[in-house]
Regions:
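Short glycine/threonine-rich loop-to-helix capping motif typified by GTGT followed
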Residues: 117-123, 284-288, 358-367, 392-412, ...
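Glycine- and Gly-Pro-enriched alpha-helical subdomains that act as flexible
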Residues: 335-384, 402
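Conserved catalytic cysteine-centered active-site region
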Residues: 20-22, 33, 82, 113-168, ...
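Active-site-proximal alpha-helical scaffold in enzymes
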Residues: 142-174, 182, 239-268, 329-336, ...
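Flexible glycine-/small-residue-enriched beta->alpha junction loops
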Residues: 167-237
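Conserved active-site "lid/cap" helical segment
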Residues: 40, 44-114, 118-119, 123-131, ...
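N-terminal extracellular/periplasmic Venus flytrap/periplasmic-binding protein-like
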Residues: 19-54, 60, 68-70, 80-90, ...
Length: 484
């Protein structure tokens, strides 16, 4: 029985909807899929699909020639003196050098960022300047939360398919070490009024309106504007509503660290990384992600306290992705142009889909709707996919979407299908680690996921891959890529 509230006790979050279970991650997905939450309305969220058949234009498919990224570094550490332009430019410069592309051939620069630099908000254009590309290359910036760089890739693909461009530099970056800190609205309005004051008495009179409390900085909140809930609170809600155990979440986190550690040790991940030389010294290279823990264990993860719901919660710092700084980039071309220039691309975009749902329902469940749409557009099934790369914002979000994939109830009530999308095979899932271990710079993660998937498909000699990304605002993204 719940303890009675006293005057010294704050109101507590609601208790879990069901008694807590201790299912493993495999059991959650393979045996308990139908405990996933559905709205019961029978009406699916709106989904936008790239094409109803294989994505191809007059000059062939859209080729992803290569991709790379900076190390992904926990905010406030090695990259604290690098802004978002620095990070995007490190990845872009390295990519241009690796591919030996003639900069004069690049038609467009498209980059995603969630928290842009206030002094230079058009990141796509600033990358052109910072990487010494020709000044006549247009630069565009997009913000689709955690799906920003996948949206940048999609915009680049669309530019190629419509003939606007032949070659596009796309990617994203985030510097959460350098998030702009705001003043209160009253302070901001007073400063604006002060800038218009012409005499000393006018300035003094304006300043006299301020009180010390007005000058307190306002820290940015990683929360939904429409619901007021933070990402973590939303993911905690998903864990409860989808009846996901703490054990299963910790198992996903452990898998992420173990696989990322192995892929770092054998060079699979470091091959994709551009070394960075952060200021002020510019003399100490940063060459690897600093969030990967090779010594992680279920026992250590189980000792961590809940982070968002202190009383009933199952989300911890260990099974959630950390705030991270980093940049990423990919080089896109029409298939025809890639062949003419002698490139062997990493792969090709076969289809993609975006979806949007009510953020007050299950904020990060978008991939459960976007993935089946992308698979249908590509003309394939989940069982045809060789590797699955899912962005790990939180382990609860991963398991929620996996359960939706496998659930007959979800398929019928949410997707209008007679059969579920399918059970994700853990042996084909995030095989070189994911965002929980590697890190999650919001604007850079999408391009990292796409590149990481294609590198591993190439190494294994496999063909088809599926990318999924959840994002703030109830957005979901999915892409099918192919190597042949």
């Amino acid at each position: 029985m719940a303890e009675p509230l006293t005057e010294s006790q704050p109101p507590q979050p609601p208790a879990p909807l069901r008694p807590p279970n201790n299912a493993s991650a495999l059991e959650e997905v393979a045996e308990r899929a139908d405990t996933v939450w559905t709205r019961g309305s029978g009406k699916s969220p709106r989904t936008r699909v790239s094409a109803k058949s294989e994505l191809k234009g007059s000059r062939g498919r859209v080729a992803i020639v290569d991709g790379c990224r900076t190390p992904f570094i926990k905010s406030g550490t090695d990259f604290r003196n690098m802004d978002v332009i620095d990070l995007a430019s490190v990845a872009a410069s390295e990519l241009v050098a690796r591919t030996a592309i003639d900069p004069e051939l690049i038609d467009l620069s498209v980059f995603g960022v969630v928290v842009p630099a206030l002094h230079a908000p058009n990141l796509g254009r600033e990358v052109v300047f910072r990487t010494s590309l020709p000044m006549n290359i247009p630069g565009v910036t997009v913000n689709l939360a955690c799906a920003s760089s996948t949206r940048a890739i999609a915009f680049g693909a669309e530019a190629i398919l419509t003939g606007e461009a032949d070659i596009v530099l796309a990617g994203g970056a985030e510097s959460l070490s350098n998030v702009p800190i705001q003043f209160s609205r009253k302070a901001a309005q007073t400063f604006m009024e002060l800038s218009r004051a012409k005499t000393l008495p006018q300035r003094m009179a304006t300043l006299s309106k301020l009180r010390p409390k007005d000058l307190a900085p306002v820290a940015p909140a990683i929360a939904e504007y429409t619901t007021g809930q933070s990402m973590g609170e939303s993911a905690e809600k998903m864990a409860k509503e989808n009846d996901i155990s703490r054990r299963a979440q910790d198992e996903i986190a452990l898998l992420s660290h173990q696989r990322a550690a192995a892929a770092t040790a054998d060079g699979r991940l470091t091959a994709q990384i551009a070394p960075a030389f952060p200021p002020p010294g510019y003399d100490k290279p940063v060459t690897a992600d600093n969030g990967v823990r090779a010594d992680s264990s279920l026992e250590a993860l189980a000792k961590l306290k809940p982070a968002f719901d202190k009383r009933y919660g199952t989300l911890t710092a260990g099974n959630s992705s950390p705030l991270t700084d980093g940049g990423s980039a990919v080089l896109l071309m029409s298939e025809e142009r890639a062949k003419a220039l002698g490139y062997t691309p990493l792969g090709y975009i076969r289809s993609y889909a975006f979806t949007a749902l009510n953020p007050g329902d299950q904020l990060l469940q978008g991939p459960a709707y976007a993935a089946p749409a992308a698979l249908d557009a590509a003309g394939v099934k989940l069982s045809d996919i060789d590797l699955v790369e899912m962005h790990e914002a939180f382990a609860s979000q991963i398991l929620s979407n996996m359960k939706a994939f496998a659930s007959k109830k979800f398929a019928k009530e949410e997707l209008g299908r007679s059969e579920p999308v399918g059970v994700v095979d853990f042996d084909r899932f995030n095989v070189t680690g994911g965002s929980i271990s590697i890190g999650h710079p919001f604007g850079a993660t999408g391009a990292r996921v796409v590149t990481q998937l294609l590198y591993e498909l190439r190494r294994r000699g496999q063909n088809l891959g599926l990318v999924t990304v959840c994002a703030a605002g109830g957005v979901g993204f999915s892409m099918v890529v192919e190597r042949e």
